[in-house]
């Protein structure tokens, strides 16, 4: 028995399912998870000494690769001054200013500790600002595990086959209207029926929790217009896409001006950080300046802020996102070519530093329902073949993949060679 298997068995005695987030348990692909000892650059190293080229990147934060020396140095310097104060610090001011500099729609910013906190707080603010109760989200999109958002949610909830989680009261769910991603008609229908009651639309501008589904042309622009007409707020959930699909996130890439934005993952450089922000007139409704309550013991933690501020400074390097996009395109197109060589139907989506692949005969995948029709058994086989080759993909057909700037020619060439061998075995 491997050390990973031993640790997993041990973990299941004290941790539900042996993991602290469901997708890590490998239920979506079968088998048992690899326990990680350390990481560096583009690689993960498990407790059994196996190295993997990593395409999860801690589920998105590691845009510069693991164990970046400048970020590590900033964290160590901050730790030496103290771990947490529960009082304002200069670095949280600098962090908020940096976010506003990069993402101009975020005129004011509130720091929190996770993406879930960010989306939960942004929705509460939208309800408080508009005086309305209902929200619109999209089937297959995931915005964290807050009660009002686990309604036909994607990601782990979808993989578990229970899109409505037990423990979510029906009274909460009834205020969440679920529409079809990339289908404006479904949104118009919701607003026709409930428009005066809808506080906001919340959307992943690139849906990264039903694999990777970019918006079709006109979709995000249509949401902006619908919100403007109905007096609702548009919330872009950029927890995943923020600083990943471009420096200004998806809103910069697609030229969309939201009322509120939520951030996570990259903003903390691997530390537990989230943020939400937007138009000053809306953000002024948050306590202590307004009546909408939000608070957090560790919000704006100085160690986490040091990591995040250093990350954002590094992302300002000219040409960085062009490099990242080129790397992603090389991997995505290489996977598609390798599959085609062996007669394996494969659709590919990618934007910026994120990508997704689908075992399907359909030439393009733009809807959640298409994702559910993909060949999940073939994905599971491919996943384990790649894992044996030392390539660490997301252990779920519903999760996006992520590249980092640390992925060089060596890592990409290894990945594509491994993919060709794996596709050959699938076809055999």
From Swiss-Prot:
Cofactor: pyridoxal 5'-phosphate
GO molecular function term, any single one: transaminase activity
Gene3D superfamilies in alphabetical order: Aspartate Aminotransferase, domain 1, Type I PLP-dependent aspartate aminotransferase-like (Major domain)
Predominant location: cytoplasm
GO cellular-component term (any): cytoplasm
Protein keywords: Cytoplasm, Isomerase, Porphyrin biosynthesis, Pyridoxal phosphate
Subunit structure: Homodimer.
Official protein name in the record: Glutamate-1-semialdehyde 2,1-aminomutase
Organism of origin: Aeromonas hydrophila subsp. hydrophila (strain ATCC 7966 / DSM 30187 / BCRC 13018 / CCUG 14551 / JCM 1027 / KCTC 2358 / NCIMB 9240 / NCTC 8049)
Gene designation per UniProt: hemL
